[in-house]
Amino acid sequence: MEEDWGKTVSEKVISAYMSLPKKGKPQGREVTVLSAFLVSSPSQDPKVIALGTGTKCVSGSLLSPRGDIVNDSHAEVVARRALIRFFYSEIQRMQLTSGKSNEAKRQRIDSETSSILESADSSCPGEVKYKLKSGCLLHLYISQLPCGYASTSSPLYALKKIPSTQVDDSLLVQASDICSSRHSDVPEIGSNSNKGNGSQVADMVQRKPGRGETTLSVSCSDKIARWNVLGVQGALLYQVLQPVYISTITVGQSLHSPDNFSLADHLRRSLYERILPLSDELLTSFRLNKPLFFVAPVPPSEFQHSETAQATLTCGYSLCWNYSGLHEVILGTTGRKQGTSAKGALYPSTQSSICKQRLLELFLKETHGHKRESSKSKKSYRELKNKATEYYLMSKIFKGKYPFNNWLRKPLNCEDFLIN
């Protein structure tokens, strides 16, 4: 059953990827990472609804205060932002189909696919209107282990490569259970005790790897662990959509995996057991989500990375796609659409549909319709995110708890922008 599920999910995702045009895909010896979200129900097999590729991030010095670039173009993050746009499309679908005067619009909507969302109970807090439809499950696929604590460079993985005759069992216990200890004097990423891309406390939050200048993006392992507490929908959507959690996580097998290595156990330790210290501090709307972990077959060659980063030639582009019509190619090191010239870099036409500014526009359209706000009443991206009070407090608790209490924070001005 487990092998069948991993194979089914990977085949669905790879088929969706192969159906896309060549633009933005690896060329020659280049490789990339592929990630996707799928949805299933008792009456529907898994279907890909959002997809992303990529391995690049914007360096710290190139971060924008306008919210007009994609800071992190790793596959998992791109897929999740494409998923958020899909949620907005589904919300719009529900609004159109609920309006009796919109018969013509209803007929133009793709009738073969029902919405994955439904109306939330009236007892839900605040203005929450929607939730994941009863019986629907969300699934995540990644072609390889996510970067950070779950990656092949983690001490936990490295110990598994030592022959069992040469390693004491206590070392494995120590490596896998590091996160159960409660250190208080841990170094901040980027602090004097931990500069640049140097060694980092193994089980704590890690910076995304970068060649050359340091990035300010947190690893995918840490972000997925956070989704297992706060949901994948983010702070803005939380104001209208109940937390959405991942039911299964499927990861492609590697040609370089050590013998007797349990990928599913490794993922459980990395993405679930690290959040257990938060079990007594959860707020009402949230839970410790425990996905089921599955192994998929080795992916096609364009997703097979060498054992060492130095030997791997990675594609600089990220594909971004979702079922509601989104399809873009992003240059990962600039966070803008492929083909953007230096002269036109600030034009709105260069912005990706998944940058903060574009997602904020969707949120304002959902919550305010087409009403124009006066300049005095306008709120910044940060202020609007913080209106999700319970989400904001839960996020603060999460980032204050070991092993996440050295969560990297970007400059405050990166979220102070307004929408004109």
Curated annotation (Swiss-Prot):
GO terms for molecular function: metal ion binding; protein homodimerization activity; RNA binding; tRNA-specific adenosine deaminase activity; tRNA-specific adenosine-37 deaminase activity. Its EC number is 3.5.4.34. GO terms for cellular component: nucleus. Highly expressed in siliques. Expressed at low levels in roots, rosette leaves, cauline leaves, stems and flowers. It is an enzyme of class 3 (hydrolase). Zn(2+) binds at residues 74, 147, 220. It comes from the Eukaryota. This is tRNA-specific adenosine deaminase TAD1. It comes from Arabidopsis thaliana (Mouse-ear cress).
